[in-house]
From Swiss-Prot:
<feature type="propeptide">
    <location>
        <begin position="1"/>
        <end position="10"/>
    </location>
</feature>
<feature type="cross-link" description="Cyclopeptide (Ala-Pro)">
    <location>
        <begin position="11"/>
        <end position="17"/>
    </location>
</feature>
<dbReference type="GO" id="GO:0090729">
    <property type="term" value="F:toxin activity"/>
</dbReference>
<dbReference type="InterPro" id="IPR027582">
    <property type="entry name" value="Amanitin/phalloidin"/>
</dbReference>
<comment type="similarity">
    <text>Belongs to the MSDIN fungal toxin family.</text>
</comment>
<protein>
    <recommendedName>
        <fullName>Phallacidin proprotein</fullName>
    </recommendedName>
</protein>
<keyword id="KW-0883">Thioether bond</keyword>
<keyword id="KW-0800">Toxin</keyword>
<feature type="cross-link" description="2'-cysteinyl-6'-hydroxytryptophan sulfoxide (Trp-Cys)">
    <location>
        <begin position="12"/>
        <end position="16"/>
    </location>
</feature>
<feature type="propeptide">
    <location>
        <begin position="18"/>
        <end position="32"/>
    </location>
</feature>
<comment type="function">
    <text>Major toxin that belongs to the bicyclic heptapeptides called phallotoxins. Although structurally related to amatoxins, phallotoxins have a different mode of action, which is the stabilization of F-actin. Phallotoxins are poisonous when administered parenterally, but not orally because of poor absorption.</text>
</comment>
Amino acid sequence: MSDINATRLPAWLVDCPCVGDDINRLLTRGEK
């Protein structure tokens, strides 16, 4: 994966509701 794709990946995840929910769930569980 190129640096450009790596940089745009977070924004792409946010644009995808399904994946975004999974990421938010992982982040919330990680913080706890």
